[in-house]
């Protein structure tokens, strides 16, 4: 998404976490493993400069990406 480098799947992942869906359930919904969800989440956090999943969700919500 723009110069941030978040894909549509990244935004879906963050939106699901924002709803309170567990990492493993997000993985099942996206047809990937929970480990892959965690790896993607770490990449998202690194790209946007935050330390935690909660911060990543808040970052995306503040920018109305999710």
Set out the residue ranges of the language-model regions:
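Basic, Lys/Arg-enriched C-terminal extension of HTH/homeodomain DNA-binding domains
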Residues: 46-66
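Helix-turn-helix DNA-binding segment
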Residues: 1-38, 63
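Residues within the DNA-recognition helix of helix-turn-helix
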Residues: 40-43
